[in-house]
């Protein structure tokens, strides 16, 4: 919303490893801001190293809301996020402070800005039928089925993503409308004035280097032990959204004996680079966003100036 009478909300978006957390902490020191995490991986407890969750020292300087709110066994939807984020925003604004939303889960930002389309509730019987078909024919065959029904959704959903794939098919079988058709119907928009920023390096190779360096740092910090603790629980599996997070899936496959350690490292870095590429694709089509260069010394100045001049 652009109405100046509405309280301001700052969005600090960007691909993974672009420097969002460091900039957010700097902003908290300069503005009356409270941070709300916009990250589908940081919601999980016990998943700290592989998600690059802010450290205890960083959280002491700048507490983050919506961290550690789910067990890895649980799911969390864009609708859940919107409900939680709106509650946190309302609380922060009521205290006379500015909500600073930080993260790279672009679907969450979209849900918050535009509202959610009226998708049908899950139907256990239809979901069971889809899973039975997958057991018989494989998810690749079901992905081909989705391709013929809803090519836009099929292009966005990987054949190895059974949760999202089955949901897209389920929506069509329940409603007779595709996921793409239904999501074009907007819900209630965000009733705040948003100042939107995206931080990323202009040089793609620099982002790739930052991703590789961070992955190796995670390994040195005990990432394998972190995932092994999850693996040894016995109630988690590779199809859960938590374990499908980049890095976790590849480490899980290594612990499961499916791939070598070196292959795990290679795949983990590649998967993270692919995530960053998807995030950048979202951001390039984003409206009303101000771009910031990773590492630039005046990024906080730009945001502060935008806030006072808006």
Curated annotation (Swiss-Prot):
Name what cofactor the protein needs: Mg(2+)
Q: What class of enzyme is it?
A: transferase
Quote the catalytic activity from the record. adenosine(37) in tRNA + dimethylallyl diphosphate = N(6)-dimethylallyladenosine(37) in tRNA + diphosphate
Residues holding ATP: 14-21
- Provide the E.C. number(s) assigned to this enzyme: 2.5.1.75
Query: GO biological process: any one?
Result: tRNA modification
Keywords assigned by UniProt?
ATP-binding, Magnesium, Nucleotide-binding, Transferase, tRNA processing
Protein's job: Catalyzes the transfer of a dimethylallyl group onto the adenine at position 37 in tRNAs that read codons beginning with uridine, leading to the formation of N6-(dimethylallyl)adenosine (i(6)A).
The protein here is known as: tRNA dimethylallyltransferase
Q: Which organism is it from?
A: Tolumonas auensis (strain DSM 9187 / NBRC 110442 / TA 4)
